[in-house]
Amino acid sequence: VRSMYTYIEQAPTVCRAILDTRDERVGGLVQLFCARPYRRLHIVASGSSYNIAMTMRDFLQAALGIEVTVGWPMSYILYDHLQPGDTFVLCLSQSGKSTNTIAAVEKAVERGNTVAVLTCNANAPIDAAGGNVFEYGSGTDDYYVGKGFPSSCTYLALFGIMAASMRGTLEDETRDALIDALSTEIGGMQDAFEKAQAFCAEHINELVRARRIMTVGIGGGYGLALEGALKLNEMTGIAANAYEMEEFVHGPTYEIRKDHVVMLVDLGGPGHERMMQLSQALHLLTDHVFVIAATEGYDEYSLELGTSSGRNVGSKSDLAAIRAIIPFQTAAEAICSKLDMLSYNLVNFDFEQEMKTKA
């Protein structure tokens, strides 16, 4: 039986290889992007790829100094395709088989925008859609994007750093500091996995008994909250939803009951103080409040991954997302293991046959 743990353990090696071969692996996309003075980057993605884009959006925007937006493929096809000519459209698809993303690439080509595609398989059907196709470098063997998520974040971080350097919006000293910070984050992935395993073992009974799980983040942490909820949804079948930090307190908190679990993500940065305030207040509503933190100052229910080396070196975003996704992945697999259940929900088989999503 396949396990998410196998791919979590493989991820640091994959991320390190992408970093070490960045000129070869990422250079082509950087050259394409820097060929013209694009003033906007619009990322089109679905599922985990959307969550990856949301996780790295703030980092890319801060590094490149241009507006970066993220949208879903069908919304792009039907409504959001009226992009200015100076917009670079980047479509993400892990498998390269997502029918909605393939159609979005075709729409962007039809509109006349420059289109690039990032995928784990350049030989997949998306290659025929007409965009400039680049491979992340994580390979096609994966399980619920266990290694694909952090490796894709690594790739996008490198794209932002290298493109910003080529465009002249990032000084050499800052570029080198960010590369070093990214390397440090990759080096901390195994430690994050070990901490996550210990944390999940300690709190596994609370996790498996949860009637509802709510994940909360801000900035890049919101992208992680989205992916965390998705992993819990698709692997365990537990009802889980993600919320932006401030929107969470404008209604959704009224739903919370004592048997609900709330998982907060704090990567540091501007939302840190408010997130700490939220974590303390939530104990009035439920005893099951957990924090995945790349910072310090939380109670015993926090999983502190260690402060990020990527902060305050020229980017307003935090590269700790590469480590901070691991606890969510670990929790989903730990629940499956504890309940001795297959992660694939077989009752959805007929539905998926009717609503095809892969080419």
Q: In which residue ranges do the predicted regions lie?
A:
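Active-site phosphate/pyrophosphate-binding segments
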Residues: 2-39, 132-134, 140-147, 151, ...
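Catalytic-loop motifs flanking and including active-site residues across diverse enzymes
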Residues: 52, 56, 151-156, 224, ...
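Glycine-rich phosphate-binding loops that contact phosphosugars or nucleotide phosphates
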Residues: 27, 34-175, 179-181, 218, ...
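Peripheral docking tails and interdomain loops at the edges
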Residues: 304, 311-359
